[in-house]
Amino acid sequence: KPHPVYAAYGKGCQVTDIEGVRRIDFSNNMASLIHGHAHPTVVEAVSAQLTKGSAFALATEQEVVYAEHLLSRNPHFEKIRFVNSGTEAVMACLKASRAYTGRPKIAKVEGAYHGLYDYAEVSQTSTPDNWGEPGHPRSVAVSHGTPQAALDDVIVIPFNDVSTALGILDEHKRDLACVLIDPMPHRVGLVP
């Protein structure tokens, strides 16, 4: 078949493609569907909200209620900002960490996906032919158009090699604003 699989619909933990083949959906929309596809409670809540409006550029009362709930669960949260995507959340966090620390660089795990922001996608698709030295992974552009400045400001640490990662972080500690980590990085070969 010359084409990728196209989804027709999903139910629970399964997705059925346009040819009627049903599969377990291990991706779950990049882990955002923790309740599975078309969970009745979720469908009911979303349907009720759609009668009130589908999207707003303004804040809503539901955001305040949800923010207060999150704040009540973690005493260290001071403020919450809702955004439209994980990419936007990562962009805001990286900018905030740079502003707070006054440091220019970030560190991230080789192969981990954190969205489509130039800095977050560095070394997302690295391969053995561009890994660099074992103790010093290279910053690799995911595609043409990534500025050299983004590559220069991202320190890449290896996945599942704590001592090497700590050594690299220690080497760059004076320049690092933050370390971008995904505890379940599905794109680096982690199989839960």
Predicted regions and their residues:
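Active-site-adjacent loop/helix segments that line or gate small-molecule/cofactor pockets in enzymes
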Residues: K1-Y9
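Short, basic and Ser/Thr-rich N-terminal targeting/leader segments
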Residues: A8-K11, A150
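Glycine-rich loop-to-alpha-helix module at the N-terminal edge of alpha/beta enzyme cores
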Residues: R22-P104
